[in-house]
Structures are given as structure tokens and as C-alpha cells.
Amino acid sequence: MSGDYKPNYQSSPSRKRLPLQSKDQASIYKYQTPSTLNLYNNTVNNNSSNNSNNHLLHNSNPNSSYLYDSSKQYSNQINIRNNSNSNSNTNNITSKKASSSYSINNKVDHNSHNNNDDDDIEDDVDINYSTNNASSNILHNRFSNSNKDDSYIDYSTDENPKILKQPQPLYNHLNNQIQQQQQQQQQQQQQQQQQQQQQQQQQQQQQQQQQQQRNNNNNSNSSNNNNTSTTIKRNNQQIDNNSNKNIISKFIGDPWKNFYYGSNKSLWPFERNNNSNNSSNNNNKVNFKQAIWIFIFSVLFIGCLLGLFSTNFYGIHIYFPSFSTTKTNSPFNSTNNNIQFSNLITKEQLYPIIDEYFKKNEILKSYNKLFEKIENDIKYLSEREQYKDIINEIKEELKLVKLSNMDEDRVNQLISKMINHYNNNENNKQELKELLSKSIEELTKLKSDSKEQLIQISTESMNQLGQLKSESINQLGQVKSESIDKFQSTLKSLSKEEQSKIEREFNHQFNQLNKDADQLLSQHSLKIEKLREEINENQQSSLLKLTQEYKQLEERLKEFSSKLQQSISSSSMDQFESWKLVFIKDIEERINKESSKLTNQYIQLTQQFTKIQSFIKDNPSIDSLTNTIESLEGIKLLIEDILEVYSADKIAKVDYALGLAGASIEYNALHYRVSETYPPIKGSGSGSGSGGANGNSLGLYYYNLATNWIFPQPKPNPPETILDPMVNTGSCWGFYTGNGTIVIRLAKKIAITEVTMEHISSNISHHIDSAPKEFQVFGLINSSDIGQSLGVFTYDTTINRHLQTFKVNKIQSTTTTTTNQDQNDDDNIQEFSHVALRILSNHGYRYTCIYRFRVHGYQIPHPEQEQIQIIQEEQSFKQEEINQQQIEQIEQIEQIEKQQQSDEL
């Protein structure tokens, strides 16, 4: 017995073995002869009273067969021990070697108990009693601590086994364990029942509260609707409660009980040992087991909660796995269980029954469309406060109707209840089909009732909605008709008044223009005659004046000299002569200056006269004034010819491209780039005339900045010069070659009618070849617009007009729509905020100069925007006043504080 013990049981075929696998007994096999088996049968009958509790448990729970078998094994083992004790008086042979070997084996680690497997009981091959057997260690630890002698049975010979000493208190200990387990099970069942009752009470309270709220809101509904809704709710509650009970019984039922109590070993680590002499090491190991089990149960509890949340509070999904083919980690597939789940009804067998139900259930889908239509009508009417009460009632009725519909989840719950109680037998299948047919009939009845209720509710709601729609349509029609009549009347009155006013103003302005034209013609004709007379008279009068003034001066000198001679005495003659010489020199200088001025004026007058004569010769129309005055066009040309000589900026049209009015150059246009300025500054990027440092000539740039105050360099005119009203020789914007572009942001958004290109006159300019020849104008809605062409124009230098105006193509707007047929076409012209000028060619010079570019047009009135601007200006003015008041208050407070400080000092 010192090593591994291997009995030769093949020589004794009449022997039978009995496994002893309790937690308080060694895992060895005790072989018995037929004589001992008779004793075993007698003791079983005698000790039937000890197994009464197990029979009660078996009868109370039909699925507790494993618990019953385990208790039966315990009782059989106890009876065998009692019989062996009766024979111990005759065979009191002890084996010290066996006890010593078991004491040596008890030094093995106690933690190997968890890895012990006793599934090889039925094998008839060699059986090894190794020193690492955990159950033998546990047995020896428990019996070694007791004061009583231990007894074992020796099977080393083929004869009857030798009976050793056995522990007498083992029977009591096993009974205590069974009672404790039963008590724990009863307590757990009671706790579960209490929890279920509490949950049911809470659900009932919540449902009662919901019913009270619904009843308060649905007092106006009919009694039939209330009765149907309450019956549907009760049925739904019963279905939910039954499904919850079946699910709980499914997951806490027989498989788990069999898992814990089906085997002879007890895996529960929280049992208390009555032996007071256990060592501290065993207590520590038990505490470690408890911690592990607590961790496992906490993880399982958290997983269950997550599963419930993942199902969106609709309950646990019912699955129908085929346990015969697949293996999962669920407790139903554990090896310790002997239940065969392949006998259950599969999902495939229930498909035809369920399909019949869902085919009938497709009828309700058509009612969902009606619900959607009704909800849309409710949303349309919910915007008005008049129909709030009716809309709330309709919403509540729809909720009740929707609750009455059966879902697939509820059908699955009903099927799961039936499957939990029936196996794969033919009789049970027929019973299950009968139950399903009954349930389907009940469902069809419920559907028919719900259909009738739905039809009634839908007809009532549709009638109410139709009435509401008709009322609202009538009200809207009345309001719209009244507003349309008012609008038409106001339009007629306004149109008549405006037409009369416009006609009056037009006639008045036309008459005034005719009068002004006549006055201008008469005035200009008189001015021309006066100019001719003045020119002739000025030539003669200027010469006469000069001679007369010279003579007068000489006479004055003579008189003055005579007077001086008389007044001066003989003593001061020398001084007088010196003074006389000085005075004469001063007078001569003054005379020379005045004479030079007069000669210059005379020369200028002669030059002007010659120019006028040459102009008259070049224009024969001026000679025949009598013929040209008869037509207005001739008069206008005559006036323009005369004004061209003296001035050049008198077109009397608003320029929206004027820089002083708010126009500017747009450098950030998306599709147009401003050309580079000519000439560029050395050591600087010419860009747009602003002069920025270039990467290659950075040193020259800083050198020029440092020496600019000593050696000033000429700067080119920027592109903004074309927006300046002052036009002088050289004050132009130039760019290289004859092709260039520039974008102008107008002062205001206008409808463009005309464009004016201005250059200095050929009589003044050094070279007229730098003037632009052909150019194109684009109208832009904003800086990122491609633009629309307003026309291509040519600036003619052969005509004696340095300021030339061109009419622009009219572009219709795409946004505005004309509703009135009498509306003018000018009101539908597109407005532009930017203008792009593209020079196509010049008159042959290496660069091109633009002196001034003008844009003419008119603003289209927008009364809404004007009102917004007025409101914004008023608000800003009020805010400024408030700010000024606050500033004054702060200043007053500061002054008061300063006075107080000065008084304190």
C-alpha cells in the first residue's frame, strides 16, 4: 500500500464495484462479493426512512431526477458503511502500512480538488491509486483530525475483503449536508418568488397609473372603445406575464439544478464544515474559492443585464438551436447533464403553422397606411390652436389601436411557452398543433374585433378630419377672396393715380425741356456774337490802352519831376539827383514788367483768335449758322464744338465708377486678373502698381527704400487713377502691350445703360497712339461671376471728341418675373455690381494708357431693402445716443470721484 495500488479484479468476475464519490470520502473503488450485495439490498430497505426527503423533492419537481439520484447514492454508501461496521468486530485487522501511505499522500496540495475527474468509473481497465488523488487527501485530513480510528477495506487478495476501521460520524455529516442544500434551495425559491411578486406588483401599479391617465384623457370617447382597449390590454398583460414566467423557468429550471446537484460531488464552495479542528490553510483556500465564485456570478449577472439592454427592452429572443449537431458554451450543452435536447420540437416543424398566421396578419399592413395618412393630417392641423383638443383625442385613439395589434415577438413568446412543455413525440405534436390552432382562432377573432374597431375609429376620424378640412378650406377661401379683392381694388386705384401723375409730370417736364432748349440756343447765339465782337475790340482796344498808358506815365513823370525841382532847394540837388536816378530805374522796371504782361496777353488773344478762325474754316457749318439753327441736331453739334474748346467734362450723367462716390478696383475677382502696371519700379514687383518686394531683387528693393528720400524715383500711377475725376496729361494708368483687363466694383448695384471712355485730346497729347482702340465690357453680378458681355466698342481718335460715350446691350434678368402686361421692359433689366473692362487693342504703341472710364445707369428701387436700411440706421443712431449717454454718465461719475478724493485730501 506504499505506492500505487492496482487490484487484480479480472480473476474475480463475480465481484462488483461501487463508486464512493462524496466530498468527505476517498476516491477509491470498493469491490464487494455477492454476499455483501445482499447486505446492501437489506440495508436499502431498512433505511428507506432516511430517503423520504429525497422522494419528496423528486415528486415536487419533475425535473429533479438528478438530485434524487445523488441523494440515493449517498444513502446507499451510508448503508454499506453501517454493514461494514457490523463485521468489524470479527475482522479487527489493521494495516499500519496503509495508514502510513495515506498520511504521506495527504501532503499533496489541496487545490487539486477542483481538477478531479471521476468520469472513468465505468472503465474496466487498470485503475491507479496515485499519490496526487485530491479526494483521498481530503478524506485523510478530515479523519486524521478526529480522535476516532480510521478504517478501510483491503482488496489485496482474492478472498473476502478485509474490513478496516471506518468513520462512524460520516452518516450524520452527509445528512447535515443534504439538509443544508435543501434549505438553501428552498430559500432561493422563496426569494425568487418574492422578487417575481414584487415585479408583478410594480408592473400592475404602472399599468394602473397608465390606465388612469388614459381614462382621464379619453372621457369623451365612447364606451365601446374603452371596453375593447381594456380587454386588449389585459390579454397583453397575461401574455407578457406568462412569457416572463416561462423564460425564468427555462433559465433557472432543471438544467441548472442538475448541473449543481446531478453529480455526487458538490461544487458549491460556501458550505460550512462542522469540524472545528480544520487548519488555517484550508480556510484560506476556501476563501479563495469563494472569491472566484463571487467573481464568476458577478460577470454572469452583468452579462444578463447587457443582454436585456441589447434586446431594447422587448424581452429575450427565443432561439431554437439544434443541440445534436452544434455545441455552445450554454449550460444546456454541459457534459455533466444527461438530458437529450434533440427530442425537442425544432423551428422547422413550426414554420408552416406560423406562416398561416402571418399570411393572415398581412391584412393589417394596409391599415398602417391609413394610420400614416391620419398622422399627416393631424400634423397639418396641429399648427392651429383651435383643434388641439380634437387632435389629442385622435392621437390617443391611434395609440390604443396600435397597441391592439399583435407583433411577431409576442407570437414567438407564445410558441416558446409551448415548446418548453412538449417534446418531439407524435401525440405531443398533435396537442401542440391543436393548441396553436386554438390560439390562431383566438387571434383571428381579436383581429376581426380590432378590424371593426379600426374601421369605426378610422371612419369617425376621417369624418372629423373632412369636416375640419372643409371648415379650414372655407375660412381660407373667404380670407383669400377678401384679400384678393382688396389687393385688386388698391392696384386699380394706384394704377390710375400713378398713370395720371406720370402723364402730368411727363408733359410738364417736356415743356420745360423745350423752354430750356430755346433759352440755351438764344443764349449761346448771343454769346457767340459777343465773343466775336470782343475779340475784334480787344485787339484794337489793347493797343490803344497801351499807348495811352505810356503817354500818361510820361506826363506824370514830367509833372513829378517839375514838382520835385521846385520843392528841392539848391543845397540838396546832389541827393535829389541820386534819388531821381533810383526812382527812374524802379519806374522803368515796373513799366517793362507791365508791358511784358500786356504783350503776353496780346499774343494769347491772337493765338485764340487764329484757332477760332481755323476751327471756323475747318467746320463750314459754323459759317452757315442760319441753316443749322433750324434743326436741333445742328444746334447741339454747334454747342458741343464750342464746349470742346473750353472744357471736356460736361456730360451731365452720374458716374457710378467714380472713386469719390465709393467705387474701387476689385483685385480678387475669380475669373479676371488685373494687368500689371507699366512701367514697373526697379527692384519691386509691379503687380497692380502697389510696388511689393520681389524675391530675386530683394536687396535692390531695400536699397531703394533707404535711398528714396535722397534719390527719389518716379512711381507709376496705380489702377485707381482711372476712377479719379481729375484728368491731366500723364495722369493715366498704363499697362504693357495693347491687351489688358481691369475689374471695377461700382459704387452701387445698377442697371447699366452707357459706358464712357475718356482720353486727353490729340491736340494736347504727345502721342495719341497709346490710347485704347477696341475694348469689351462685361457685367458681373458679384466678384465670382463669369459675367455677361455688354458689347464691344471702338475709341476713335480721328474725331474731335476725347470723351466718347457708348450705349450698352440690354440684358434681361433671370430672377425677376413680370406679372403685369403693362410693365416696362426697363424694369426687367439685370443689375450688376461689378464691371470688367478688357482692352483688345490700341493704336500701335508699346503700352496702353487709360485716363478715365465711366459707367452710367440707374438704380432699380427695392422698397424692402430701403426699409431695412432705414431701420438699421435708426437702430444705429439710437445705439450711438445710448453710448453717448453712458459715456457722459461715466464721466460724471469720474468727476464726482475726483472731487471726493480732492475733498478728502
From Swiss-Prot:
The chain crosses the membrane at residues 291-311. Keywords: Cell cycle, Cell division, Coiled coil, Membrane, Mitosis, Nucleus, Transmembrane, Transmembrane helix. One of its GO terms (molecular function) is identical protein binding. Residues 129-146 have a biased composition (Polar residues). GO terms for biological process: cell division; centromere complex assembly; centrosome cycle; centrosome localization; mitotic sister chromatid segregation; nucleus organization. InterPro entries: SUN1-5 (IPR045119), SUN_dom (IPR012919). It is a single-pass membrane protein. It comes from the Eukaryota. Residues 117-126 have a biased composition (Acidic residues). It is found in: Nucleus membrane. Residues 312-905 are perinuclear space. Residues 41-67, 75-101, 207-227 have a biased composition (Low complexity). Residues 107-116 have a biased composition (Basic and acidic residues). Residues 1-21, 41-166, 207-242 are annotated as: Disordered. Its main location: nucleus. GO terms for cellular component: nuclear envelope; nuclear inner membrane; nuclear outer membrane; nucleoplasm. Residues 170-221, 359-456, 504-609, 864-901 form a coiled coil. It holds the Pfam family Sad1_UNC. SUPFAM superfamilies: beta-sandwich domain of Sec23/24 (SSF81995). Residues 662-860 form the SUN domain. Disruption phenotype: Shows significant reduced growth. May have an important role in defining the spacing of the nuclear envelope lumen. Essential for centrosome attachment to the nucleus, maintenance of correct ploidy, proper mitosis, association of the centromere cluster with the centrosome and the maintenance of genome stability. Requires direct chromatin binding for inner nuclear membrane targeting. Homodimer and homooligomer. PANTHER family: KLAROID PROTEIN-RELATED, SAD1/UNC-84-LIKE PROTEIN-RELATED. This is Sun domain-containing protein 1. The gene is sun1.
